[in-house]
From Swiss-Prot:
Tissue: Detected in cerebrospinal fluid (at protein level). Detected in urine (at protein level). Expressed in brain (at protein level).
Disulfide bonds: 374-387, 381-397, 399-412
GO biological process terms, semicolon-separated: cell projection morphogenesis; cytoskeleton organization; glial cell projection elongation; intracellular transport; nervous system development; positive regulation of substrate adhesion-dependent cell spreading; regulation of synaptic vesicle exocytosis
Molecular function per GO: growth factor activity
Protein name: Chondroitin sulfate proteoglycan 5
Post-translational modification: N-glycosylated.
C-alpha cells in the first residue's frame, strides 16, 4: 500500500487533504467494503502510519487541479508523492475510526456490525458532511487494546461491489471499525439493512466486566451466559473492558431485585406519638403470633439465592422480600421495637416468651431489651403528670393538682381551669335560687287567692238582709221565727200543731220517751240557760234582734235548749 512518507515523523495528514479524499470517495460511485478486522491489526496500522501534526505556523496552499498526466483520484502529499484514495481512506479510518461506505452502491445498502455491544448498531448509510469529517479527524479517538489477535479478515462474496467508471484501477478498500465504541451518532439511529453475506464471527474478550455474577469457569466466561451479549454461543462481539459503557444497560440485572422500602423495616414516628392506636396493631400482632410459625404462614424469606440455581449459572445471588410492617414490630426475632400487650390478656404478661420478643405490660422492646414506657417516653403523661407502672394494668398517669386547676384523662390530656369551676358553681347556685323563687311565688299566689275569697265572703255576709238570714238553712234563728215555739213544758201535755215548732218535735219526742225524768231535766236546763246567757256569744251574735230591742223570753229558752241538746 502506498503511504505518504515525505513528511517528518511528527507530522500527519492535514485536514484539507482529508476533505479532498472524502470528496473523491463521493465522486467514485462505488467502493467495496470488507469485514471488520481485528483490533490488533487496526492498532498495528495506526502504529505503522506516521503521526503527522501540522505546526501552528504551518501554511499550505490550496491544492490545485491535478495535472493532465496524473490520476484524477490521486492527490499530492506534502512530501511530493502521489497518494490515491485508498491510502487516504485507510489512514483516515485508522485515525478517526470511521467506515467510509457508499449507500448508493448497487450491492450495499448499509452495513450492520457489532461495535462492542449487545445490540446491533447501524453504520451510517450515507456519508457524513465534510465539516463533520473534518471535526472527527482533528479529534483522534482512543484505540482500545485488544487482548486476543485474530487472522486476517477474508472478504465474502457479498462484499464485492460493481466497479465505477471514474476510478482507473479496482483495488479493494479496507474498512476499519472501532470495536471499542466511538461517540454516538448525533443524527440519531437510522434504519439498518441486512448485509449481503455473513460476517465472520470474531472471538470475544476474555474479561467480563460484571460484578454481579459468580461461579465463572476457568476460561473466564459463564457457562450459561448465552443470552447475554458477548457470550460464546453468539456471533456478537463482547465489549472491551477499557472502552465506554456498552449500549445494553446494566439495569437489566436489577429486574429481580425488590427496591428497599425503609417503612417496612423501621416504624414511623407516629408509633411513638399515637399510643392510643395500639389496640388495632396489637390485635394484628396477636393474630400473627398465635397462628404458628411466621415463616410458614407469611413466607418470610431471608436473603438467599434462587432455588435450584447453583454456582456458575450467572443469575443474581440474592433476592430481597419485603417484610410487612406489622410483623417487624414485636413479632419477628431481632426486630427493634415490640408492641405493648393489652392489659389483662392471658399469656401476655410473661417476662419473655420462647423467642424472647415479648415484654410485660407497661414495657416495650427497644434495641433488643424491654424498657419501661415511662422511661422510654418522658412525656407520656401530659400537663406535668407522673407516670407509674401498675401490675396487670401497665402505665398509669397521676395527674398534677394545682389551685383551681384539675386534670383528667388516661394521660392527663384534659384540663379543668378555675374559670370552668366558677362557671359551674355560679350556674348551680343560680339554679337553686330559681327553684326557691318559683316555690315562693307558687305558695304566695295560693295564699292570696284564699285571702281574697275570705274577704269576699265577709263582705257578702255583712250586707245580707234579715229575710235572707231567716231563709238561710245554716242559721239557727229560723226556728224561732216570730212565734212561740211549740215545745211542751211537760211530757204529758198535748202537742200543738204550730208549724213553727216542728223543728223541735224530734227533740221533744226523744226527751219524753227515753227518760221518765225528762221534764225535770228540761226545767233545769232552762234555768241554767237563763243564768249563763252571757256565756253564749256565738248564739247571741248569730241570733236576730227584734226591731224594738225586746226579745221574747220563750225564744231564748228555745235557743238555749237547742244548744244544749245538740
Amino acid at each position: 500500500m502506498g503511504r505518504a512518507g515525505g513528511g517528518g515523523p511528527g507530522r500527519g495528514p492535514p485536514p484539507l487533504l482529508l476533505f479532498l479524499g472524502a470528496a473523491l470517495v463521493l465522486a467514485s460511485g462505488a467502493v467495496p467494503a470488507r469485514e471488520a478486522g481485528s483490533a490488533v491489526e487496526a492498532e498495528e496500522l495506526v502504529k505503522g502510519s506516521p503521526a503527522w501534526e501540522p505546526p501552528a505556523n504551518d501554511t499550505r496552499e490550496e491544492a490545485g487541479p491535478p495535472a493532465a498526466g496524473e490520476d484524477e483520484a490521486s492527490w499530492t502529499a506534502p512530501g511530493g508523492e502521489l497518494a490515491g484514495p485508498e491510502e487516504v481512506l485507510q489512514e483516515s479510518a485508522a485515525v478517526t475510526g470511521t467506515a467510509w461506505l457508499e449507500a448508493d452502491s448497487p450491492g450495499l445498502g448499509g452495513v450492520t456490525a457489532e461495535a462492542g455491544s449487545g445490540d446491533a448498531q447501524a453504520l451510517p448509510a450515507t456519508l457524513q458532511a465534510p465539516h463533520e469529517v473534518l471535526g472527527q479527524s482533528i479529534m483522534p479517538p482512543a484505540i482500545p487494546e485488544a487482548t486476543e489477535a485474530s487472522g486476517p479478515p477474508s472478504p465474502t462474496p457479498g462484499d464485492k461491489l460493481s466497479p465505477a467508471s471514474e476510478l482507473p484501477k479496482e483495488s479493494p478498500l479496507e474498512v476499519w471499525l472501532n470495536l471499542g465504541g466511538s461517540t454516538p451518532d448525533p443524527q440519531g439511529p437510522e434504519l439498518t439493512y441486512p448485509f449481503q453475506g455473513t460476517l465472520e464471527p470474531q472471538p470475544a474478550s476474555d474479561i467480563i466486566d460484571i460484578d454481579y455474577f459468580e461461579g465463572l469457569d476457568g476460561e473466564g466466561r459463564g457457562a450459561d451466559l448465552g443470552s447475554f451479549p458477548g457470550s460464546p454461543g453468539t456471533s456478537e462481539n463482547h465489549p472491551d473492558t477499557e472502552g465506554e459503557t456498552p449500549s445494553w444497560s446494566l439495569l437489566d440485572l436489577y429486574d429481580d431485585f425488590t427496591p428497599f422500602d425503609e417503612s417496612d423495616f423501621y416504624p414511623t414516628t407516629s408509633f411513638y406519638d399515637d399510643l392510643d392506636e395500639e389496640e388495632e396493631e396489637e390485635e394484628d400482632d396477636k393474630d400473627a403470633v398465635g397462628g404458628g410459625d411466621l415463616e410458614d404462614e407469611n413466607e418470610l424469606l431471608v436473603p438467599t439465592g434462587k432455588p435450584g440455581l447453583g454456582p456458575g449459572t450467572g443469575q443474581p445471588t440474592s433476592r430481597w422480600h419485603a417484610v410487612p410492617p406489622q410483623h417487624t414490630l414485636g413479632s419477628v426475632p431481632g426486630s427493634s421495637i415490640a408492641l405493648r400487650p393489652r392489659p389483662g390478656e392471658p399469656g401476655r404478661d410473661l417476662a419473655s416468651s420462647e423467642n424472647g420478643t415479648e415484654c410485660r405490660s407497661g414495657f416495650v422492646r427497644h434495641n433488643g431489651s424491654c424498657r419501661s414506657v415511662c422511661d422510654l417516653f418522658p412525656s407520656y403523661c401530659h400537663n406535668g403528670g407522673q407516670c407509674y407502672l401498675v401490675e396487670n394494668i401497665g402505665a398509669f398517669c397521676r395527674c398534677n393538682t394545682q389551685d383551681y386547676i384539675w386534670h383528667k384523662g388516661m394521660r392527663c390530656e384534659s384540663i379543668i381551669t378555675d374559670f370552668q369551676v366558677m362557671c359551674v358553681a355560679v350556674g348551680s347556685a343560680a339554679l337553686v335560687l330559681l327553684l326557691l323563687f318559683m316555690m315562693t311565688v307558687f305558695f304566695a299566689k295560693k295564699l292570696y287567692l284564699l285571702k281574697t275569697e275570705n274577704t269576699k265572703l265577709r263582705r257578702t255576709n255583712k250586707f245580707r238582709t234579715p229575710s235572707e238570714l231567716h231563709n238561710d238553712n245554716f242559721s239557727l234563728s229560723t226556728i224561732a221565727e216570730g212565734s212561740h215555739p211549740n215545745v211542751r213544758k211537760l211530757c204529758n201535755t198535748p202537742r200543738t200543731s204550730s208549724p213553727h215548732a216542728r223543728a223541735l218535735a224530734h227533740y221533744d219526742n226523744v226527751i219524753c220517751q227515753d227518760d221518765p225524768s225528762a221534764p225535770h231535766k228540761i226545767q233545769e236546763v232552762l234555768k241554767s240557760c237563763l243564768k249563763e246567757e252571757e256565756s253564749f256569744n256565738i248564739q247571741n251574735s248569730m241570733s236576730p234582734k227584734l226591731e224594738g230591742g225586746k226579745g221574747d223570753q220563750a225564744d231564748l229558752d228555745v235557743n238555749c235548749l237547742q244548744n244544749n241538746l245538740t
